């Protein structure tokens, strides 16, 4: 855009890189180089010498697409500018490098040979040169910023115009679409209402027909249910009578078996108890006889002593002692008789208790057997009734399914008949319309 190649405008940025920092090259040593030109390494500029203010360039979408397309082709692109003999500038999309050759230093040697009195360049001359370069660069940067601001203003105005146009187009299209949508919605609502009315009429007719058929089927099912109930009651009464007979027969058999078992047990237990009672009575009787014999022996000894005392005519206190002894012996005899009577009474009581226990055990066993038989009979009855009811339930469910299938088939037939009638009605209406149109045309002609 500009004749000077050093000027870089941010508005013209094909690589989409934005502003770059100026790279300051270090000073070469002042020794006279006799060989070929050496490249100096590039060092990024410090923060003190960052004279450029980074600004983001305003890039339109078209320029972005153009830059993205050119990135692949311009990867290896670089530009070489010879500013002066011995001072070469290389500009790439990422950096700017400067090369100082021998020619620049040879020129200094010539100046020294031509003007030997002046000597070498002083530092003041170098500083003045650098200040001139800095002033030129600041002017370039100011020009770039002005160009950038003007380009940004132009692009913003163009974008505002385009946005306004796009908004207006969008509003117009949106209005047209809304109008078309409202018209379509109104048409669809009208069509839907008409279809709903027709379907409601057809559904009411179907409901009336279905109600009549349902009443008929309900009455038929009730009669069938009553007949099945009567049959089930008859079968149940017969089975009940059979169960009662079987129960009586089984009870009699069980009671006879238990009676035999209990009689055998009672005979065995009574024999053992008789043996025990006889043994106890014999032991008591033997003890009584032994005690009786001992008492008789004592009595005889006492009588002998009395006779001896009578003969000797002892003192009367001895007689009192003997009388007391006889009195004690008689009391013991009376106690023995009482004990025998009590033992006999207790034996009778034990026999009565044993008999009562035996009879109670028999009754308990009978009741247990009756309860067990009743439980078994109830379980068998429950199982049989469950099986019978399951069978009846299965039969009834199958019949219900069959009836539902019949109802569905009849409904389908009715629907087909209604659809055929509607088709015939529509065809007849179309024929009548065509006939009326033909008659009107003939009258007009």
Swiss-Prot record:
Residues 26-47 are annotated as: Disordered. The modification N6-acetyllysine is found at residue 376. Keywords: Acetylation, Cell projection, Cilium, Coiled coil, Cytoplasm, Flagellum. It is found in: Cytoplasm; Cytoplasmic granule; Cell projection, Cilium, Flagellum. Residues 30-39 have a biased composition (Polar residues). Its main location: cytoplasm. One of its GO terms (cellular component) is outer dense fiber. Residues 122-226, 283-315, 387-414 form a coiled coil. It comes from the Eukaryota. This is Flagellum-associated coiled-coil domain-containing protein 1. The gene is FLACC1.
